[in-house]
């Protein structure tokens, strides 16, 4: 049964028998296999639906052709708006550091960050995954000074809200706290903790947007809710949904890959 196995940081579709890995043919069987002088655990696992995997697990998806880890963050994401069956994926690490917007506008709607996530970023994913993204209904405010409830918008990929991260400083709730919120408070880029944007307008830092700021504390790392100015270079962290019926396979390290 073909599936993806990470070998030396690269995902290979292994069918069993003789497989080509890094230009060399190897005889692959379930169990231990010696590849390039290193022993790997090879298991031909059973395909399972994405929505049966415990939130917090890692799913590897190709980004610009290379495997990147994503948290399986929530099943039936915002089901009142999206219906049942959509699973939220959040990039484990930030993609890069970038400004929220290039003009003095403190809202997410059509900001530089919003435009990049919804328009450019999805094209980095494999076409087979991109076609499954569709549009996800999310909530955010269209104006820093608007009262009442946040608006409802559809996006292919987006930044999380401060509410979803467990924060309380937004003008009003945008969605609900994610079951793995505590795992998302600290964001990293190239192994270094960094601040990450949210799509939320802050009730305390008007017209800024909420950000989770990394604080240096001896021997610990702590994510705290704070504020970020429009041009600050903070972390972009793509999130999107995939069908819960998508078949995935567990690897020997406990992570998952999309079934071939």
Predicted regions, residues:
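Intrinsically disordered, compositionally biased repeat/linker segments
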Residues: 1-44
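Collagenous Gly-X-Y triple-helix signature in extracellular proteins
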Residues: 2, 43-260
């Amino acid at each position: 049964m073909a599936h993806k196995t990470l070998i030396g940081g690269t995902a290979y579709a292994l069918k069993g028998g003789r497989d080509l890995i890094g230009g060399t043919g190897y005889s692959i069987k379930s169990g231990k296999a010696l590849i390039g002088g290193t022993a790997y655990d090879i298991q031909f696992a059973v395909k399972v639906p994405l929505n049966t995997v415990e939130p917090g697990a890692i799913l590897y998806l190709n980004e610009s052709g290379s495997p990147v880890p994503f948290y399986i963050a929530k099943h039936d994401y915002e089901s009142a708006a999206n219906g049942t069956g959509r699973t939220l994926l959040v990039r484990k690490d930030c993609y890069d550091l970038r400004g929220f917007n290039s003009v003095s506008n403190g809202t997410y709607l059509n900001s530089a960050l919003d435009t990049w996530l919804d328009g450019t970023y999805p094209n980095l994913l494999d076409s087979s995954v991109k076609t499954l993204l569709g549009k996800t209904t999310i909530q955010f405010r269209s104006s820093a000074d608007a009262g009442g409830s946040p608006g409802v918008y559809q996006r292919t990929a987006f930044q999380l809200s401060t509410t979803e991260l467990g924060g309380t400083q937004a003008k009003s709730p945008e969605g609900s706290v994610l079951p793995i919120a505590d795992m998302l408070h600290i964001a990293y880029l190239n192994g270094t903790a960094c601040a990450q944007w949210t799509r939320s307008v802050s009730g305390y830092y008007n017209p800024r947007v909420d950000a989770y700021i990394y604080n240096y504390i001896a021997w610990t790392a702590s994510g705290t809710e704070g504020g970020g100015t429009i041009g600050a270079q903070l972390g972009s962290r793509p999130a999107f949904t995939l069908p819960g019926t998508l078949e995935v396979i567990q690897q020997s390290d406990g992570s998952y890959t999309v079934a071939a």
